[in-house]
């Protein structure tokens, strides 16, 4: 480079080659689907198109995510900011204990489903916050509220094997499953199941700025 700049002559140089391997290959993928260590299902009104759409987007962002030993998983960092530009729609959310409408309504049902699946799998909960009022899709105290500029849901993998998140939605239900290798010695926890009974829809105030879905 120096000769080229000072003398106008071309020069050649050899760059060392270093192999870069993916963290996840087909062999690891097969291994991690051997044992289900956690799962949870919640239910929602599929006739609420906007909320269902938001749930679908969040579920797709979570599906097939890996968390390696000692790693922490952040719900907010995985999904990113929920904006209209990313396809999220206005739907009912909880704001300071009241029902309102905002972009990304329904996302907290996904984070709450993930929390219960993760807790059942015996993973370490690092950060979790509850809504300011009970939500209908999980038992009291079993929710995990999230907001881009506010609460996050974070967990850590304390095991000596990676874990795989599988997430699905459709037909009015959201299911999240946690898988790992057959050799994993996990410590599962008892977690109460969600009710299949759906609440009645309620009117919402659209003039709200700070939202927590």
Give the positions of each predicted feature.
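Well-ordered beta-sheet/strand-loop patches within structured domains
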Residues: 2-213
């Amino acid at each position: 480079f120096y000769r080229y700049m000072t003398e106008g002559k071309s020069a050649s140089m050899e760059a060392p080659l270093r192999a870069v391997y993916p963290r996840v290959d087909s062999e690891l993928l097969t291994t991690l689907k051997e044992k289900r260590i956690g799962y949870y299902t919640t239910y929602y009104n599929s006739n609420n198109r906007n909320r269902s759409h938001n749930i679908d987007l969040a579920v797709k962002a979570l599906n097939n995510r890996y968390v390696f030993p000692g790693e922490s998983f952040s719900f907010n960092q995985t999904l990113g900011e929920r904006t209209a530009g990313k396809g999220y729609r206005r739907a009912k959310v909880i704001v300071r204990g009241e029902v309102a409408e905002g972009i990304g309504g329904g996302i907290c049902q996904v984070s709450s489903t993930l929390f219960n699946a993760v807790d059942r799998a015996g993973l370490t909960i690092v950060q979790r916050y509850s809504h300011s009022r009970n939500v209908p899709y999980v038992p009291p105290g079993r929710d995990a509220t999230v907001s881009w500029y506010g609460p996050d849901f974070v967990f850590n993998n304390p095991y000596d094997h990676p874990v795989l998140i599988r997430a699905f939605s459709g037909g009015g239900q959201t299911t999240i499953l946690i898988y790992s290798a057959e050799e994993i010695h996990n410590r599962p926890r008892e977690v109460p199941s969600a009710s299949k009974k759906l609440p009645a829809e309620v009117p919402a105030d659209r003039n709200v700025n700070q939202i927590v879905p």
